[in-house]
Amino acid sequence: MRKSFYSWLMTERNPKSKEPKAILADLAFQDTAFPKHTDDFDEVSRFLEEHANFSFNLGEFDAIWEEYQAH
């Protein structure tokens, strides 16, 4: 079974980095409602669009998701 997106993303945390992946990782870590146990694109994307306590460029999210899928 694939590691959840959140679990994979947490390996990219670096609060000092300006890379989109590291920024998203830090924002997701701080948002207690972020979906932690899914590998479903629609679920995570919908959360970012409708429920996240932060804003993030969804085009950058798509690129990060592609990297996650390739991992």
From Swiss-Prot:
Transmembrane region(s): none
SUPFAM superfamilies reported for this sequence: YozE-like
Highest taxon of the lineage: Bacteria
Cross-referenced InterPro entries: UPF0346 (IPR010673), YozE_SAM-like (IPR023089), YozE_SAM-like_sf (IPR036806)
Similarity comment text for this entry: Belongs to the UPF0346 family.
Protein name: UPF0346 protein SSA_1617
Annotated source species: Streptococcus sanguinis (strain SK36)
